[in-house]
Amino acid sequence: MRQTSGRVLAHCLRLWKEWGQGSMNNTQSKTLLTEGSIWRKMVVFALPLFFGNLFQQLYNTADSLIVGNFLGSNALAAVSSSGSLIFLLVGFFNGIAMGAGVVIARYYGAREINELQKAIHTTVVFGILCGLVLMTAGLILAPQILIWMRTPKEVLPESTAYFRVYFIGSLAFVLYNNFVGILQSVGDSRHPLYYLIFSSAVNIVLDLLFVGVLHFGVASAAAATVISQFVSAALCLYRLMYKSPDD
């Protein structure tokens, strides 16, 4: 755990060092919000955030479209019944990641190494704990949550199966949002979007394979989403741990 967060800190420090040396320019992946035109920098930084939120919703949308076409209306209802709660969870953890990013950006900009290290460690550990708690709660409480949401009885079994498999991947989307928050806090909002677009494509391909070709059922659509979310989280973690800021 400390080794992982230490590598993340090392990445941030490499960015900081090159920033201090003035070796970074506008063609690089990092957007320096303190230099150049304010409006242009805001647009360049904010557009990936907007499209990132859009593509995060594409997971459930793709599941609904593919399941509805291959498995029928009941299966579509089973997937769609969880859409609002998934939207709420994504928004909630996006907010937490943004809050953590503000703290990290502050210490990064002030060059307070010790506080930056603590903030990164706390963000990573908190994300893992939240993911595990959410996974456990989802596995246990999925049927009751769906009943509270007034899910029709005829689709409740399939909806519960989808929901439980989706919650198994809670750790992936929580960590993804945390890693994105760290990257964005040092000015890189584009690479998380690239990874999310790629993982969305992976999700669609796996949906078609699991549901359309192998006929595994509604739960397999959730499994496709979980796999693709782990892909996006792993790509973000790889960039934080191993890639140079200029890559």
Residue ranges and their predicted role:
Residues 49, 53, 65, 102, ...:
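Transmembrane alpha-helix boundary and packing residues in multipass membrane permease domains
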Residues 54, 58-77, 146-153, 209-216:
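Helix-terminus/linker motif at the lipid-water interface of multi-pass membrane proteins
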Residues 127, 182-206, 223-226:
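Alpha-helical transmembrane segments of multi-pass membrane transporters/permeases
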